[in-house]
Each structure stands twice: as C-alpha cells, then as structure tokens.
Amino acid sequence: MGGLTKFSSYFHSIFSRFPLITFSNPYPGENEDYKTKTVMYLTMWNSDLNSEALDVNSLQWQTWAKLNDPSIVFLNVSNHASPDEKVPFIQIESRKLVLNPSLLQYFLKDESTLQQISPWMSLLINQVETAILLTMYLDNENFSEIQKKWLPNMSWPLNIIKSIGLPSQIKRKICLQLNESTLDFDAILEDASKAFSALSELLGSDKWFFNNESPSFLDVSLFAHAEIINHLPLKNDQLKVVLGTHKNLTDLTTRVRTLAGYTSAGPIALR
C-alpha cells in the first residue's frame, strides 16, 4: 500500500505544477463553431473520425474521449499549437485550456482508480514507450522506413520537421530519462518484454484489467501503445513479435478498437 501511496503522491506533485488555466486572451483563438464545446487537439491525425491518430499519446486520449465523452470535438494540430508544446490538450468552450500533464487529473478524478493504475501505467510509459521510441528512431533501417511510410502521411511541414535531427533528439531524451550516457538496446527491449509479461499476467483471462465491466484508462493506454507497435512500418519488429506472444493483450486491443469504432490508422486500413 505504501508503494501505491507514493505513486499517488507523485501524480499529485506533477498535477500541482500544471493547474487548469483560464486565459483572458484564449489560445488557440476562439472559434464560433466550437464556442460551447470541448475541443481536444490531437497531433498526427488525418481528421477522419474513424481513423486513429499516429501518436501514442494522442491516440490514447482520442480513444478515451471517444469511449467516455462522445461530445468532445477533435482537431488536428502540431505540437507548437499548445502553450507547453505538448499535445494532446483540450479547450473548454473556447476559453479554459487543460494542458497535457493535467488531462489525467481532469478525466480521472477518482483517487482509488489513480492508485490502482499508477504502477501499471509506469510500465507502459517508462518501459514500453521508451522501447517504441528506440525502435522507431534509433534503429537505422527502421527510421528509414518511418521516413518513407509514416512521416510523409503527416501534413507539411510537420513531416519535414519530424525527420530532421529527430534520432539525436530522441536519443538525448531517452538517455536523460534513464540517466545513462549510452543506450543498451537489448536491455531496453528486454525491459519492454518484461512489462508486457507483467501486464499479460495482470489481465489473465479477464476481458478488461482488474476485471472491470468496461475499459479503464489502463486498457485504453495499453491499446494505444499496442496499436502503434502493430502498425508501424518496421523492418526490425522485435517489439511487435514480443507483443504478439501475449494473445490476451492483442485480444484486448481488438476489443478497444471495435468499441471505439476505428477503421483505419492514418492511411492504414484496419482488419
């Protein structure tokens, strides 16, 4: 229980730095079409309501909103559209902005739920997401495929911006996160494999994590990470192979996709 309390305290310490912000001069600018609506700004999304965003965090919150608040309107933007350059974020009735670090607190207000999912979310954020970034951008063959088949599907100039200097930026980010000067690719992939094994064991034969009757945020987050892994155009796809060994996780992914009504991931038709 002490560990869960620490996770909860950690989330509160982060949230306290990023309160809900009301701007006297709203940013982005007011739009008459959405003046009374809540708008979620996504990145790497083609604006098709049945299509998945091609960014893990955008897909995660896009899916959560589709399942829990269908009234939310989605718009595609670049990271620079956000005051803190982190997407997604939401704008409420053209005035109040809820920035990315505050989304979890905004949508999940139940303390017990946060405590329950925190240790498992950390596996996805720290182990799996790190391995995704490494696989996409720091494997030369994979990055070549990403440049040809993934980034071009993004709007100009975002596709150009994303492809220039991105590997070195990602490497610095991961080194800083892991507090390492060099990266051990095999160790990072092994950590992701262990994370999937732990999540698979947690799910067991249940339909949703914690035997809930409907998808929790952990289910949605697992879905988002798994979808990106499954649809990335990679030559070296060890991460996809590892994920595929856990049938209960892939089945959960299919269930969430069906509930959310997705038929494509960017230009990729889903079957």
Curated annotation (Swiss-Prot):
Keyword S-adenosyl-L-methionine: no
UniProt-recorded name of the protein: Metaxin-1
Protein origin, superkingdom: Eukaryota
InterPro entries for the chain: Glutathione-S-Trfase_C_sf (IPR036282), Metaxin_GST (IPR033468), Mito_Protein_Transport_Metaxin (IPR050931), Thioredoxin-like_fold (IPR012336)
Family: Belongs to the metaxin family.
GO process annotations (BP): mitochondrion organization; protein insertion into mitochondrial outer membrane
Complex formation: Associates with the MINOS/MitOS complex.
Localization of this protein: Mitochondrion outer membrane
Record's keyword terms, sorted: Membrane, Mitochondrion, Mitochondrion outer membrane, Protein transport, Transport
Function: Involved in transport of proteins into the mitochondrion.
Taxonomic lineage of the native organism: Eukaryota, Fungi, Dikarya, Ascomycota, Taphrinomycotina
GO CC list: cytoplasm; SAM complex
